[in-house]
């Protein structure tokens, strides 16, 4: 199967929108390789070679740190039900924190969610699909709400302290969120 495309087609964008999650892979020189799962409700296809997602506060900051150091990123979407398929978007990512250039332009594209820390914008240079025959079929039970309820319970002040503690540098000591982050 494995085809390569120059642009994200409307059909591919619709298919992406039906997937409940995606995976983000990044690496910086001489650092650990990182792969993180993300929920799709925060992901947007902004154009044929441009995507972004609203990044929520987590216990690590590897994706942000790696993008600041290197910029390379791969996003992977898998069909867990229906016809088997894997779609990968290869590109270069930019971190847009509140107050950064481009953040205010992108922000209206996303829902208001507690704990947002940045928008990750990706310029996609390669789109490739593959058969997905090795991806298991799974039934989605539903989203987990623990991240959102925990963030709401802590409130903005405690979340800012948490980000200072957990999100200012990666596990390899690379810079994560900037000091201006609320």
Which ranges hold each PLM region?
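Binding-site signature for planar aromatic cofactors or substrates
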Residues: 1-182
